[in-house]
Amino acid sequence: MYRHDQRTVMTLDAGGTNFVFSAIRGNQDIVETICLPAVSDNLNGCLTVLKKGFSAVKRQLENEPVAISFAFPGPADYKNGVIGDLPNFPVFRGGVALGAFLEEEFGIPVYINNDGNLFAYGEALAGILPSINEELKAVGNPKRYKNLLGITLGTGFGAGVVIDNCLLTGDNGCGGDVWICLLYTSPSPRD
């Protein structure tokens, strides 16, 4: 699908422990990965790590990047690039316009999405799902799969759901996540 796209995009997988920076072109990594410790309790420290990581990636590039795209835990206002109220990142409590900050810093568009969603969508469009469907086709089996549940395990626990090749995002960007479950320790007044 994107194998022939020659645009360069800087990437980040933002985990609770590490920030992993890279760049892709034609659906392939094109630079050495840069792994920096995540800073979750100091906003200036976190922003400095983000600038440092993307700047280090940019120095490795032969061509100017056209965008920054990265995966961040949720929930968040991904569409507007605002990260806030994450259990593993108290530094973002109340909301931080991370997308706008990075757009101003690097002068290119910034796209942020949920890490579980991006994992699942990538596997559905260009990963395991097309591979399975190709294997089925090769042996003459007419069955094809278009649905996928992707689970991510790291510092946190995330998930993404793809149904009929469409990503289920929900109202907070975490439609497939099971990031929080309510535990009632006392009976409900209705019981």
Predicted regions and their residues:
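Gly/Thr-rich phosphate-binding beta-strand-loop-beta motif of the actin/hexokinase/Hsp70
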Residues: 2-27, 152-163
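N-terminal phosphate-binding loop and adjacent alpha-helix
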Residues: 30-64, 82
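Glycine-rich phosphate-binding loop and adjoining helix at the ATP-binding site
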Residues: 39, 43-44, 67-68, 76-147
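Hydrophobic alpha-helical segments and helix pairs
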Residues: 141-171
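A short, polar/charged loop-to-alpha-helix boundary motif
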Residues: 174-183
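Conserved small/polar residues in nucleotide/adenosyl-binding loops
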Residues: 184-191
